[in-house]
Amino acid sequence: MKDNIIFSKIWEDIFAIQLKAVCSSSVATITTEIYVDDDLIDELIFQIKQFLDGNIEEGLWANGEKGDGSTACLSLRFFNKDKLGHINIEVYAELDDGGKHSEHNCCFFVETEYGL
């Protein structure tokens, strides 16, 4: 299986956007629904650009707080795996499957490289 992260818009209004996130690696695949707004999307774009331009060594983005007190959280921490252009993205996802987010979550790495 090819590693990837795919976001698909489910709906939006003037305050929020609901996204379906599918994150896949050789060891795990998760599907979860998260809520974001324009500012959170802009922050993810900014973090990725800063990382790719070499302005930061590591980027971290999350759509909210981890835990049972809110909607499902998805966080992405990205950093260089080596000097050959390989990148690791640590995916932490709370699964919105009816259980407590503190108990129904997973964390794994998605591998990619510059230019993909």
Which residues fall in each region the model found?
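Generic recognition of cysteine residues
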Residues: 23, 73, 106-107
